Regions:
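A generic local secondary-structure boundary/capping motif
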Residues: 71-73, 158-161, 233-234
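Long, hydrophobic, amphipathic alpha-helical segments used as structural scaffolds
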Residues: 34, 38, 115-122, 161-164, ...
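Sequence/fold signature of self-assembling virion shell proteins
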Residues: 40, 184-269
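N-terminal "assembly arms/tails" that initiate or stabilize quaternary assembly
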Residues: 1-68, 227-228, 233-243
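Short, catalytically relevant binding-site loops at active-site mouths
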Residues: 125-128, 176-180, 210-211
């Protein structure tokens, strides 16, 4: 038995497999940060904090003593509860392949948005300084005309190179910005293809962010520490529903402030 208590749930192995598959597929669809940051772990549920390598001076216990305390980043535990219909679960054992796992997919989307939001936008309550908050590069708005996005991205790439940040580089676009780029043409040529010609990395759909980010993927600049990776646990059940949850523990460290350029959403005209 572990802290997920899955063996107590009235769910067959076949149904568990379907639920897990749908959840994993949804997470893969919505998670963007894990494609561009360094992933450390999963190190297990017992991991409570990671060291930053820094020290802070504290009051000494006596004369002639210098006291310092090591700085750590405590991991954040995120949990998203959801309920599944027991009839749908039991139908799987009878051969059904069309059970409705939408609540599980909704939970996966919610927790994926939360993780990406913490990494890119920050999560002060969890002690996480996001990339937008921590970048030392100027933050400028995206152009109001999507046809000018390539110029804005090219300028951001130039900013990174000028501060000594090597590539490869990737671009993450929020849902609205990505849709605008995918649909736009400049004199008949797709704007998305124009972006792909100037960016040596990926152009990534990142629906949890606002605006865009241009950053290096050379490694060593952004650390995502995972304790317990996304896991489904059991809470309780009734005659009609099974109450589950999707959970993870993590923290994020921005190691190089100049390694990213953040672009805010376009200013309405």
């Amino acid at each position: 038995m572990n802290n997920l208590h899955r063996e107590l749930a009235p769910i067959s192995d076949v149904a568990w497999a379907q639920i897990q598959e749908e959840t994993s597929r949804t997470l893969k669809r919505y998670l963007a940060a894990r494609r561009v940051v360094d992933l450390l772990g999963p190190s297990g549920v017992a991991l409570s904090a990671v060291g930053t390598g820094h020290l802070q001076t504290i009051a000494a216990p006596g004369d002639g003593i210098i006291a310092r305390q090591r700085e750590v980043k405590a991991l954040v535990e995120l949990r998203v509860p959801f309920e599944l219909d027991r009839q749908m679960i039991d139908d799987v054992e009878r051969g059904a392949n069309d059970s409705d796992w939408q609540p599980a997919k909704d939970a996966a989307k919610t927790i994926a948005f939360a993780e990406d939001g913490a990494i890119f936008e920050g999560y002060s309550a969890g002690g996480i300084r996001g990339i937008r908050q921590g970048t030392s590069n100027p933050i400028e708005p995206l152009p109001t005309d999507v046809r000018n996005y390539p110029d804005a991205i090219a300028h951001s790439l130039s900013v990174l190179r000028l501060v000594g940040v090597n590539g490869p580089y990737s671009v993450l676009l929020g849902a609205e910005a990505y849709t605008a780029v995918a649909e736009a043409r400049d004199y008949g040529y797709p704007v998305l293809e124009h972006l792909r010609r100037i960016v040596d990395g990926e152009i990534i759909w990142a629906p949890a962010i606002n605006g865009a980010f241009v950053l290096t993927t050379r490694g060593g600049d952004f650390d995502l520490h995972i304790g317990q990776d996304f896991s489904i646990g059991y809470s309780s059940h009734t005659d009609t529903v099974v109450r589950l949850y999707l959970q993870e523990t993590f923290t994020f460290l921005l190691l190089t402030a100049e390694a990213a350029v953040a672009l805010s959403p376009a200013t309405p005209t």
